[in-house]
Regions:
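Bacterial N-terminal signal peptides
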Residues: 6-15
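Positively charged n-region of N-terminal signal peptides that target proteins for export
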Residues: 1-3, 17-18
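Mature soluble domains of exported/periplasmic/lumenal proteins and thiol-rich metal-chelating peptides
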Residues: 49, 54, 65-66, 132, ...
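Low-complexity, intrinsically disordered terminal/linker segments enriched in charged
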Residues: 150-171
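Solvent-exposed loop/turn segments at secondary-structure junctions
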Residues: 70-72, 124-127, 156-160
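A solvent-exposed, acidic/Ser-Thr-rich amphipathic alpha-helical stretch
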Residues: 53, 57, 61-110, 114-116
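Short, low-complexity N-terminal intrinsically disordered segments enriched in polar/charged residues
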Residues: 16-53, 57
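Exposed beta-sheet edge and beta->alpha loop/turn motif
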Residues: 114-148, 153
Length: 171
């Protein structure tokens, strides 16, 4: 009986150990997202109040924005121009309008090429005097070593937004 009990306990203990093979093969790991959330929230607040200059101060010179229709806007100047244009259409641009926005901080990459990103899921609201559109919104925001926004990838259904435009500003 003692031998069987010893064997069972040994297997139970060994099966609880974390093996190196359970690590992410791409080297990604979760990190505390607090600082990235603060930056993303400040960026969102700047957009929501129409303070494009403040939003621009949080962007890296090589910043970019990817949209679900395949459009990539590259370079800080191009992103700022897009924000100015969209801000003419919407008086409210709130990319975390839902109280249930979920965040996840992730880091990874090879030595010397590390990256960190904030993943967020929630609702985005775009509104003006005549219309309000709220869509489920998924976003990945990459940050530079200087905690500037390096790139944003937004994933959402653009159908209602495009229907609101006379001319789609993101094409």
């Amino acid at each position: 009986k003692k031998i069987f009990l010893t064997l069972i306990l040994s297997f139970a203990i060994l099966s609880c150990e974390t093996t190196t093979s359970s690590a992410d093969p791409d080297g990604r790991s979760l990190i505390d997202p607090t600082e990235m959330i603060e930056i993303a929230t400040a960026f969102n607040n700047a957009l929501n109040t129409g303070d494009i200059e403040m939003a621009a101060s949080m962007l890296d010179e090589d910043a970019g924005w990817s949209f679900p229709n395949g459009v990539n806007v590259e370079g800080k100047e191009a992103v700022v121009a897009l924000l100015e244009n969209v801000n003419q259409i919407w008086t409210t641009i709130d990319q975390s309008s839902g109280e249930d926005t979920a965040y996840l901080g992730v880091t990874g990459g090879d030595e010397g090429e590390e990256w960190k990103a904030l993943l967020s899921w929630g609702e985005a609201t775009y509104a003006n005097d005549s219309k309000s559109v709220t869509v489920p919104y998924h976003q990945v925001t990459w940050f530079t070593d200087d905690n500037l926004i390096g790139w944003i990838s937004g994933l959402y259904d653009r159908t209602e937004l495009v229907a609101s435009y006379d001319d789609d500003p993101i094409k």
